[in-house]
């Protein structure tokens, strides 16, 4: 999806997808390990074919990378709500896409704990494995 590089955007795509590759991790319990460790050891990747469902995505510009990984970030939930996860790859089918620029977003960040200490490098390793830094 093309959009100006400095615009925050939210997207919902509902429809039937020819293929979609998603990843998920088992539920974790305290003390929480860094996500990059969990993904290396326990990530499960599923490829779904001809599946009905919804993608929800956010796109943040590089200037907002402290809030979310720059560029698009999508999650998927099947229509029957039995399968879902972080989208790694997909082939579209039929569907409807809704895209909206967002100027306001309210986020409550944890004051302490594992989420407050995630490094940009570990986030990039989880969200964009193998990606080269654009900085």
Regions found by a protein language model. Give the residues of each.
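Long, positively charged binding patches that form subdomain-scale interaction surfaces
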Residues: 1-58, 65-67
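Short solvent-exposed loop/turn micro-motifs enriched in small/polar/acidic residues
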Residues: 4, 67-69, 90, 100
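Histidine-centered divalent-metal-coordination microenvironment in nucleic-acid enzymes
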Residues: 69-77
């Amino acid at each position: 999806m093309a959009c100006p590089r400095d615009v925050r955007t939210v997207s919902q795509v509902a429809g039937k997808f020819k293929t979609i590759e998603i990843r998920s991790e088992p539920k974790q319990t305290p003390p929480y390990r860094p996500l990059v460790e969990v993904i290396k050891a326990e990530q499960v990747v599923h490829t779904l074919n001809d599946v009905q469902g919804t993608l929800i995505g956010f796109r943040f510009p590089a200037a907002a990378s402290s809030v979310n990984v720059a560029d698009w970030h999508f999650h998927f939930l099947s229509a029957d709500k039995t399968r879902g996860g972080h989208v790694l790859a997909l082939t579209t089918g039929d569907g409807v896409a809704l895209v909206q620029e967002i100027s306001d977003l309210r986020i409550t960040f944890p004051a302490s704990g594992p989420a407050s200490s995630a490094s940009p490098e570990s986030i990039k390793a989880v969200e964009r494995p193998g990606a080269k830094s654009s900085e």
